[in-house]
Amino acid sequence: MKRLFLSTQYKKDYKKYKNDFKKKEALKEVLKLLKEEKPIPAKFLPHMLHGEYKGCMECHIQGDFLLIWFDKVNDIIELVRLGSHSELFG
């Protein structure tokens, strides 16, 4: 089982959504899959990123609610960012 490392920016991003139950539940589902090293279902549109986030993965937790993570060595996944397209890329 992998461990999750929360970046400082991820923690800040998460605070914006901490009261949104639906988004938090969907996020928990994806985080559980990541920790258990299971594939992210196609409904979340998982894909590799390039540019500023080269080497990271992204998926759509719910609509325009995105998670960016980096699968590090030593069984650690770094949660990099959380938010909308405009918040993350714009």
Residue ranges and their predicted role:
Residues 68-70:
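Short, charged interaction patches at domain edges and termini
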Residues 82-86:
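Short, solvent-exposed aromatic-acidic interface loops
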Residues 1-63, 72-77, 87-90:
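Basic, Lys/Arg-enriched alpha-helical interface segments
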